[in-house]
């Protein structure tokens, strides 16, 4: 009796295994995003709402930020420079053909600590490292997963970003939009289909856990549909220019704070960042945290701010974000950058057109798109990220602003060397 399997059956079996494993990766990514955001929500509720309501400690914000920063500094001195951002993780995958997965619990704790003390960073850093690490663990321990480990890691990172930002196509373009060759490879074959399977599983698990146990972060609020007037189109150049100025400021301060941080010994640099964060948060609480919830508040109360005050907040938010990232209170930059772009857009639109809702929404969209385009150099990813925040009719204008930003800002911050904690 001939037990030899036909090539067709073997190919079908391999394809099914690929689809099932990608669905599993997506489900794990969705669950991890939910766990991180839930712990973050419970922790911040306790530290910043429940505990202050039960005590009357003077300078509470400064105390929590400094004490938390000291803990983070000691943690990083013991375990290393975590969390790593998406670009660092994927660069290691490209250069080393693998990613170390032995420190996944450390990555999770390192990602959570800055978020709990109100650091001006987003939650995406750390998540991608954990997901990619799990994929390489599977490649080392599961025979059928070994040959596709890099693809699995890219899909896992993309799904985690998409679920986190509630933007289905953002993750895949953020991971893949590095060159025209990458985009061409993405549109050929079955990679988009496989990503769709993983995304469906991740979104389903995240939605299910949120329905059963409550969600953590709710994602950026969506702006209402507005009428775009001729004046708005004429002001596009001004809004794009403002976004470019912010992008240049972000990149310049990223490099500057990185150079300054290297002069501080371990733990001291984190404490310094915590002190700056606490002082800034005491005077202007909107500067703390990622900016996701703060933007919802801003959408309702922006008319109570002077336009120049909103513009100032945009610059201070970017400066504080870079200070936190480079001085050890690390996290992602997407949420704070979007918040800064919206503040600048609101401020400029109010200066030129008054506080009318339609004008300020359009201004916020164009400034934010130009700003993100200048930082990320990925106009498609920027468009997909902002697609669910702003009205659909702005889609093409957002893409144009992001494309202009990605081409005109050339100051690229160099990768700052990680602090060597073992010698300090």
Which residues does each PLM region occupy?
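Alpha-helical transmembrane segments and immediately membrane-proximal extracytoplasmic
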Residues: 1-424
């Amino acid at each position: 009796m001939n037990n030899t399997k036909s090539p067709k059956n073997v190919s079908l079996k391999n394809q099914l295994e690929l689809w099932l494993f990608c669905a599993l990766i997506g489900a794990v990514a969705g669950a991890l995003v939910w766990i991180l955001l839930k712990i973050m929500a419970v922790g911040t509720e306790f530290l910043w709402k429940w505990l202050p309501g039960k005590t009357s400690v003077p300078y509470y914000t400064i105390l929590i930020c400094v004490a938390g920063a000291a803990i983070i500094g000691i943690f990083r001195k013991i375990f290393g420079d975590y969390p790593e951002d998406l670009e660092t993780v994927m660069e290691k995958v490209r250069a080393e053909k693998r990613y170390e997965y032995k420190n996944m619990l450390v990555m999770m704790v390192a990602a959570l600590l800055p978020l709990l003390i109100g650091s001006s960073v987003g939650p995406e850093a750390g998540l991608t490292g954990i997901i990619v690490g799990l994929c390489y663990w599977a490649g080392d321990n599961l025979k059928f997963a070994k040959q596709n480990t890099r693809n699995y890691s890219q899909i896992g990172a993309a799904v985690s970003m998409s679920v986190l930002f509630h933007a289905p196509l953002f993750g895949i373009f953020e991971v893949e939009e590095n060159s025209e060759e990458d985009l061409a490879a993405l549109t050929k074959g079955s990679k988009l289909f496989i990503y769709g399977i993983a995304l469906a599983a991740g979104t389903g698990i995240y939605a299910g856990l949120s329905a059963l146990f409550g969600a953590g972060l709710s994602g950026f609020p969506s702006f209402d549909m507005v009428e775009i007037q001729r004046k708005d189109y004429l002001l596009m150049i001004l809004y794009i220019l403002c976004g470019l100025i912010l992008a240049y400021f972000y990149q310049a301060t990223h490099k500057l704070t990185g150079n300054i941080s290297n002069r501080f010994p371990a733990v001291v640099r984190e404490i310094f960042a915590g002190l700056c964060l606490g002082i800034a948060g005491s005077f202007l609480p909107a500067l703390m945290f990622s900016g996701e919830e703060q933007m919802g508040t801003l959408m309702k109360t922006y008319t109570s701010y002077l336009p120049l005050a909103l513009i100032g907040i945009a610059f201070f938010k970017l400066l504080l974000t870079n200070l936190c990232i480079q001085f050890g209170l690390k996290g992602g930059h997407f949420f704070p950058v979007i918040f800064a772009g919206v503040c600048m857009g609101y401020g400029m639109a109010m200066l030129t057109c008054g506080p009318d809702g339609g004008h300020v929404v359009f201004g916020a969209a164009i400034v934010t798109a130009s700003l993100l385009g200048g930082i990320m150099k990925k106009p498609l990813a920027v468009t997909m990220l902002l697609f669910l925040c702003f009205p659909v009719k702005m889609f093409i204008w957002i893409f144009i602003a992001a494309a202009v930003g990605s081409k005109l800002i050339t100051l690229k911050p160099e990768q700052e060397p990680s602090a060597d904690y073992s010698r300090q």
